[in-house]
Amino acid sequence: AGSKEYVDWIDGLFTENPLKNVTKWKDKFKVKVVDYPSDMEADIRAQMVGGDKSCRILSSYTRKWESMSNLAPLHDADADFDFDLADKNGKRWQRYWNNPNGYAIYVQGAGNSMMHQDPLSEVGCPYVVRGFDFDYVGLLWLEDIYVRNGKWYVSIKHNEETATASSRKRARDEQKEAIRNKFIKGKMKDIDEVPGFDPRFPAAHALFETVAQAYRILLTRAIKGVTIYIKDEETRAYVRELLNGE
């Protein structure tokens, strides 16, 4: 990212004590939170028109890789979209995940690929962009990590990363044990939302930290600025308050 102070702010965002240092970096690095995915895309495209060609759209692992079987540089016309999100005015915002054939296709827009034709045509995952920077980044912040009454939670169900399967199972088993012992109320089949910072639930905290780290990676890929679509209204309001210094 283009500002050390901003990186420090991101490091503190997913904690119980977020930094209040926005005034130190807001003139060096642009952060904008929007209400719809199309608003995010439009903002990033405006930067491209202005001459900043190195722009990408990113997301954490909230969606399955439905298009994984399509291994050609160009997605098949009838391939299922990985991202199919409700947008303004009853419309849908749709995209594919990055092509799994190699980092160069997404990062460099190499070959006869969708990314060569349009740098915003695919959504990049944390693995594909780790270690790479872009002028501007658009982020899809969906259902996997969110705020309730000022406290962080992580969703077990809305996480499609294969590497976290064991972590998700441990967090779920931890909740089941707590329900059996009547430490908490709930139904086994409904287990999903787990607290990020409850000392009674270390497995939940470990899962939260893994997901939060993915967001730290995504939110620090931009050199000049990031535009964030946050699906959850309460989380969106929380981040906006922090950006406003409240």
Regions found by a protein language model. Give the residues of each.
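Conserved helicase/translocase motor-coupling segment
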Residues: 2-153, 205-208
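C-terminal accessory regions
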Residues: 115-246
